[in-house]
């Protein structure tokens, strides 16, 4: 029986046509989301200006920041966001991943439109996924990082930062700290000047001054308290009966004497605490020429402890000899209208990048770019070496050529799948600019893009759950003025 000439044949044909239309619509939706960041790829130096749901102004060229602040409801676009977050863990390659997804979907829709079933194309794409490592390894360049050679670090970060001034200051900070850790390279944002005025300063910088009269210290011992320098107050209320003025004076003197003895018993030259500093304590600390600094963040308290050494004490008590740290210098400096304090340790090297710009949104983006550069190096450098590939689109062109050559030696659907990947990679422009990309980031982006597109064409339907409607309005008592009889 010839099904094609029957009513059943028409139903099958219509079903296949509906499936193509559905995937075309879904693919177009995902491509619209991808096009949000398409113009940011390469050396465009463009950014997106975003006003999020809280009214905050953001300026960013990173897909993770853009998608996090743009409300989306489509399940596949949300899945795309999850893959972008996975790329951010590696540090680089998120924009390349998004653009490649868009191009792969376009090529896949053309192939499916010519008769290939979506499920079949998806399985062929997953097969091609396994060969990426072999093809990419042929284009790998091993590069050694040398802290003494700034150019060896610049070579890696040039394609990541895409900003000459930002690249220079990050490279200088890394070469001085001899580390890629964000704990060894801190960032201080100053809302004045421009990025060209940014510089590197030794030590950890805080945007506040010491509390007392003493603003500077050299070669001193430190004591860190995770509590306020304040008179302890009990939880329960109590009543003290005083009959005469002399009793009140005696009580006050006893309290002052106790505080004075406690301050004198603290043998540290620099005292760091996490709460308020009482005026009585501050008065005795000033007389003892002790520097007092307040840190409100528990994370910064932990960092300063790692920098200076010693222990964090939870109660206000005289520290043991082994509980105190050592500081080489505590100094203050001024930038714009704000004064800052820096702590320098002789045992551990920490450097702070003082980033300057008059616009807060630009400052925040520069900070994100610095963190991105540090993540790229810390996640991808192993044994002092990092894998690189030719940048400026040359890696994509060569990989495209490799996939197209392989497709020529194959037949059937597999040939179409390889050709689809080759064409998608071939859409990226290339130039002769001497820049390099991170090998691991490129390979992960290729794998994730194929995985995402395969998932898209394996999804028969998607569901969106509605959030529960919470009745939080006031109660309407319509008969409030009627008396009960």
From Swiss-Prot:
User: In terms of domain of life, where is this protein from?
Assistant: Eukaryota
UniProtKB keywords: ATP-binding, Chaperone, Cytoplasm, Nucleotide-binding
Asked if the record carries the keyword Secreted, the reply is no
Signal peptide (UniProt feature, chain positions): none
According to its record, what are the GO cellular component terms?
A: cytoplasm
Q: Where would you find this protein in the cell?
A: Cytoplasm
Pfam family name, one: Cpn60_TCP1
**Any keyword Magnesium?**
no
What GO molecular function annotations does the UniProt record carry, in alphabetical order? ATP binding; ATP-dependent protein folding chaperone
The family annotation for this protein states: Belongs to the TCP-1 chaperonin family.
Q: What is the stated purpose of this protein?
A: Molecular chaperone; assists the folding of proteins upon ATP hydrolysis.
Q: Quaternary arrangement and interactors, per the entry?
A: Component of the T-complex protein 1 (TCP1) complex.
Write the protein's name: T-complex protein 1 subunit theta
Protein encoded by which gene: CCT8
């Amino acid at each position: 029986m010839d099904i094609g000439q029957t009513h059943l044949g028409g139903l099958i044909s219509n079903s296949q046509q509906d499936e193509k239309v559905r995937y075309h619509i879904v693919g177009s939706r995902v491509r619209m989301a991808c096009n949000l960041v398409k113009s940011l790829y390469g050396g465009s130096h463009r950014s997106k200006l975003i006003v999020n749901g809280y009214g905050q102004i953001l300026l960013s060229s990173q897909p993770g920041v853009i998608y996090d602040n743009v409300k989306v409801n489509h399940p596949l676009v949300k899945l795309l966001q999850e893959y972008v977050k996975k790329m951010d863990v590696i540090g680089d390659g998120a924009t390349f991943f998004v653009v490649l997804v868009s191009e792969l979907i376009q090529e896949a829709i053309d192939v499916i439109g010519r008769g290939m079933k979506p499920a079949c194309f998806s399985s062929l794409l997953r097969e091609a996924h396994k060969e990426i490592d072999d093809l990419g390894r042929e284009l790998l360049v091993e590069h050694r990082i040398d802290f003494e050679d700034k150019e060896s670090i610049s070579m890696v970060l040039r394609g990541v930062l895409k900003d000459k001034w930002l690249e220079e200051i990050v490279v200088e900070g890394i070469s001085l700290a001899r580390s890629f850790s964000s704990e060894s390279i801190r960032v201080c944002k100053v809302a004045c000047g421009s990025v060209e005025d940014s510089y590197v300063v030794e030590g950890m910088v805080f945007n506040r001054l010491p509390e007392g009269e003493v603003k500077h210290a050299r070669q001193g011992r430190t004591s860190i308290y995770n509590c306020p320098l304040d008179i302890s107050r009990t939880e329960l209320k109590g009543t003290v009966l005083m009959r005469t003025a002399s009793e009140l004076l005696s009580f006050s003197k006893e309290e002052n004497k106790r505080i004075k003895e406690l301050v004198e018993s603290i043998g540290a030259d620099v005292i760091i605490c996490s709460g308020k500093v009482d005026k009585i304590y501050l008065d005795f600390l000033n007389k003892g020429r002790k520097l007092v600094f307040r840190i409100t963040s528990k994370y910064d308290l932990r960092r300063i402890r790692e920098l200076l050494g010693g222990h964090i004490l939870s109660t206000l008590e005289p520290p043991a000899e082994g509980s105190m740290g050592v500081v080489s210098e505590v100094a203050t400096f001024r930038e714009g209208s704000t004064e800052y304090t820096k702590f320098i340790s002789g045992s551990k090297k920490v450097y702070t990048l003082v980033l300057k710009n008059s616009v807060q949104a630009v400052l925040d983006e520069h900070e994100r770019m610095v963190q991105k550069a540090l993540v790229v190096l810390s996640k991808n450098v192993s044994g002092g070496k990092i894998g690189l590939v030719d940048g400026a689109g040359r890696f994509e062109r060569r990989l495209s050529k490799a996939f197209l050559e392989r497709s020529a030696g194959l037949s059937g659907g597999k040939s179409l799948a390889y050709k689809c990947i080759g064409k998608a990679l071939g859409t990226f422009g290339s130039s002769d600019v001497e820049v390099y990309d991170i090998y691991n980031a490129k390979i992960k982006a290729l794998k994730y893009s194929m995985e995402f597109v395969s998932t898209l064409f394996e999804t028969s339907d998607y569901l969106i759950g509605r959030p529960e409607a919470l009745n939080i309005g006031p109660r309407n008592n319509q008969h409030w003025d009627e008396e009960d009889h």
